[in-house]
Amino acid sequence: MSGVNDIRSAFLNYFAKNGHDIVPSSPLVPRNDPTLMFTNAGMVQFKNVFTGLEKRPYQRATTSQKCVRAGGKHNDLDNVGYTARHLTFFEMLGNFSFGDYFKERAIELAWNLITKEYGLKKDKLLVTVYHTDDEAASYWKKIAGFSDDRIIRIPTSDNFWAMGDTGPCGPCSEIFIDQGEHIFGGPPGSPEEDGDRFLEFWNLVFMQYEQVTKDERLPLPRPSIDTGMGLERMANILQGVDSVFETDLFRSLIDATSSALGRGPGEEDAASFRVIADHLRSSSFLIADGVLPSNEGRGYVLRRIMRRAMRHAQLLGASEPLMWRLVWALVREMGQAYPELVRAEAMIEETMRLEETRFRKTLDRGLAILDEKSASLKKGDMFDGDTAFTLYDTYGFPLDLTQDALRNRGISVDIASFTDAMDRQRAKARASWAGSGEAATETVWFGLREKLGATEFLGYDTETAEGVVTALVADGKEVDALKAGDSGAIVLNQTPFYAESGGQVGDTGVLSGDGVRFRVTDTLKKAGDLFVHFGTVEEGAIKRDAALQLDVDHARRSSIRANHSATHLLHEALRQVLGDHIAQKGSMVAPDRLRFDFVHQKPITPDELRRVEDIANDIVLENDEVTTRLMAVDDAREAGARALFGEKYGDEVRVVSMGKTARDSGSNALGWSVELCGGTHVKRTGDIGLVSITGESAVASGVRRIEALTGRYARQSANAAINTAKQAAAELRTTVDDMPARIAALMEERKKLERELSDARKKLAMGGGGAAGAADGGADVREVGGVKLMARAVEGIEIKDLKSLVDQGKKQLGSGVIALVATSEDGKGSIVVGVTPDLVARFSAVDLVRTASVVLGGKGGGGKPDMAQAGGPDGSKAQAALDAIAAAIGG
């Protein structure tokens, strides 16, 4: 039973036999906690249960929760690979009691599991308790038979857990095992406690108080239990090894890495193998839960993890992208416990392959930029920390690589300014992420949900109904009535109004009754499944228990239905045209338009877009029936129904199928497009009318977006495009059919004229002082300090042409300095400086161009000693910039 998968199963089965519901792991992106970047503990998904804001159909639960600690308060990233126990991804096994059993039973369950099921020896175990928790200490004596020296009292916050400044809290008890004298370390509370000899593997939290204020703590009426055991640490213990990286799961991943590299780990590079194994897990699970690498928020942390692993792969000699070739090994080890890995395998591989390909390019680019930025530094100098962070943040160039590259030249990095820049970026990242569920502060809705129950939704079958007002809310508080002119929210016992979810906007319409009328401007879900109608009272006064007629805006709902069904058709069409890796990342379904976000690593070509649109419209024209059925979630997935990554589904789901034609081998008996969906849809595909894709763009790294119109909106857009084409053809004195050829001919003629104009400008620019091409009659060749200087200001010359002109000038002079400043149409200035070979020892083009750049309002420039370029926003100071160069030469 010592394998990781066996240990996990034994834990869950043990608690199931002891009356606990096995609850699946929640996603790594928290649904109901905007304060967390990633799920980092088993209790996260139960936070609202512990605070009393949410009720579950069970009082005891057990989970194996996937967790990531690589950002924010809990960040183990930099330690991974160099210690025996730190991981960015880990599984937390836990058992929970919500007001059911408490301290004694929790200790008894824990003790029986570790000694009877797992077979740990009592003489190797010891525990800690909070220093004032005599109750827990007495239970450990009673149940485990521990003497006082095996029960260590800890007076610090390590043994007192709190959810925050206020809320549930309580003492905790940690269980340790002595791994043997051959490992350094002392027991908890000793000076050597940070060593690895005494390994903490299970924490039992006894939630028995509520922190009301900083100075007031009251007993909870229904104390609860929250425990967390590190699965990897337990495997470490049961398999008799000294490190989590020596357990069966990690050995398998390290073996896969060795096989891919054609070499095994040595003493000097074992840490790199460990980093790759851990980061493969965290990266893969984050991608499977819908996170993609980017430069902010969660995606920023994922990119850091991935690139750290990829840097270690390069240190091990990997000449080609490596990480994506290891995903199969992870899926083999963990796919059975976490089916989302299997479903997302292709997407994980593609994301990793592309990210590593990009990273290899950025490494080369980063080295080139580092050489340029440090060219003027000498031994003993310090490289600017802000620039080092720009290399890291913008180009993905690790700090340690910057330090290594500069170390041989005797140059150090300003770590203080690098850290300041990093802190600013972390603050930006923390500000950018928001939780995917409701904030726990909306207590009014949780209270109403508990009191009233779920709202019955009638809108799949009707757009009109009668309902009874069960609650009225204004300004976040429940009220007795809403009068004419008041804005507020109404909760009903039942409703045909669809509440915004799954990307579909909420319904609007009218609630009316005897002398009253309420205009619904939006419908939202609160506290899970409480439908809330927001709007304004237009007539009369509405009170609780009033009976009302409920009428959804029919025309608006019809357009929304068409757009929602069209997103399903486009989703399947995209998969057929672009590949099976296509996965939905989000959508917006409004009455007048739709957009659909999906995983894809490159822009979609016009031909691909046309094919997607044609396939979707083929299904529309077939006018097939759209069917919905309720199915068990596992049966629906097995039947091939597509689900949204990270979306929470119940045991029973609504499956929407459309299209009967089997157009590829992936089609199934349920239909051509089959998705789990709670939205409203057309009766037949023909009701969509027409699908017209109006745009395609990138919304994040690896995420594309298409926008489209349907029905009358698509028809109006098409008519407008036709009219525009006719008007353009008339202006060009041709027909619509011949317009492409006419435009091509005009563009070719324009290019010819632009080339002729450019040649004329270049001739004028080098034609001597006072030429028409000079911006202000720029100077001819003159001597400054015994050196020939050709300094001219010109207009309309591009930077690449400036370089060729400077080369010409160097040949004309034979010996001297050439400086040309060009002013663009938007008023910006570009400058190129050239120095002939015989003068390079005296004058550096880089130094001269930087002098001029400052005058133009720029921040420097770059290049080589014989040719350099720079720019600035103020081209009006072109002559002053040239004068600065002359002064530098003469000085």
UniProtKB/Swiss-Prot annotation:
Its EC number is 6.1.1.7. It is found in: Cytoplasm. Keywords: Aminoacyl-tRNA synthetase, ATP-binding, Cytoplasm, Ligase, Metal-binding, Nucleotide-binding, Protein biosynthesis, RNA-binding, tRNA-binding, Zinc. GO terms for biological process: alanyl-tRNA aminoacylation; negative regulation of DNA-templated transcription. PANTHER family: ALANINE--TRNA LIGASE, CYTOPLASMIC, ALANYL-TRNA SYNTHETASE. Catalyzes the attachment of alanine to tRNA(Ala) in a two-step reaction: alanine is first activated by ATP to form Ala-AMP and then transferred to the acceptor end of tRNA(Ala). Also edits incorrectly charged Ser-tRNA(Ala) and Gly-tRNA(Ala) via its editing domain. Belongs to the class-II aminoacyl-tRNA synthetase family. This is Alanine--tRNA ligase. It comes from Rhodopseudomonas palustris (strain HaA2). The lineage of its organism: Bacteria, Pseudomonadati, Pseudomonadota, Alphaproteobacteria, Hyphomicrobiales.
